[in-house]
Amino acid sequence: MSHRDTLFSAPIARLGDWTFDERVAEVFPDMIQRSVPGYSNIISMIGMLAERFVQPGTQVYDLGCSLGAATLSVRRNIHHDNCKIIAIDNSPAMIERCSRHIDAYKAPTPVDVIEGDIRDIAIENASMVVLNFTLQFLEPSERQALLDKIYQGLNPGGALVLSEKFSFEDAKVGELLFNMHHDFKRANGYSELEISQKRSMLENVMLTDSVETHKARLHKAGFEHSELWFQCFNFGSLVALKAEDAA
């Protein structure tokens, strides 16, 4: 059962850095729906992409799986035999709830739910990899290495879905979309205090990049094709494709 997010409705004397702890995990479904514009669309479309890209006898990786929404969307759209999904997150609270969610929905495709660091897991025989609002929580200096590893672990013709909050090289556009996102949160019932306190906790741990920076990293990793396929305000998702004739 999901609870309503009221974590920041009262003043907090000492705001530390953001963590995905038990309190956040408990309200996460409500929090993300009210905070991330287009989240439900992205989750649904990840399933549609899975239907196109997941191949028989291959693996799908959900890196930073949180409560398993993307994993479940992928699994509902796998219609091949001998596939497996590996869902990994470093938050014990998220993983505990993710396991319960996965177990509640029976399907032929097995899911390995792993508590661990996405930087340490091997990517092998992958037809699809999902990074759904995960890369932005890694140190910027570590992001290229992860994308390189993903590219190497993808089979030819495989796909990476990379969803992120974006910054913008055009400051005027960035300011507009930032303000529209805050309007979105206000419309969903968040107060100015809640918005301000959450932003203060996130500012040191969620470091955003521009779409151009993401595309440059993907190209450097070896992806022959990448494009923004979804955007709402300063949130969006890219798909990057490994060529079918890649070595």
Swiss-Prot record:
Q: What is its EC number?
A: 2.1.3.-
What CDD domains does the record point to?
Answer: AdoMet_MTases
Kindly list the GO molecular function terms attached to this UniProt entry.
carboxyl- or carbamoyltransferase activity; S-adenosyl-L-methionine binding
Q: Which reaction does it catalyse?
A: prephenate + S-adenosyl-L-methionine = carboxy-S-adenosyl-L-methionine + 3-phenylpyruvate + H2O
UniProt-listed NCBIfam families = carboxy-S-adenosyl-L-methionine synthase CmoA, PRK15451.1
Cited function:
Catalyzes the conversion of S-adenosyl-L-methionine (SAM) to carboxy-S-adenosyl-L-methionine (Cx-SAM).
What is this protein's record name?
Carboxy-S-adenosyl-L-methionine synthase
Tell me what organism the protein belongs to. Shigella sonnei (strain Ss046)
Lineage here is: Bacteria, Pseudomonadati, Pseudomonadota, Gammaproteobacteria, Enterobacterales
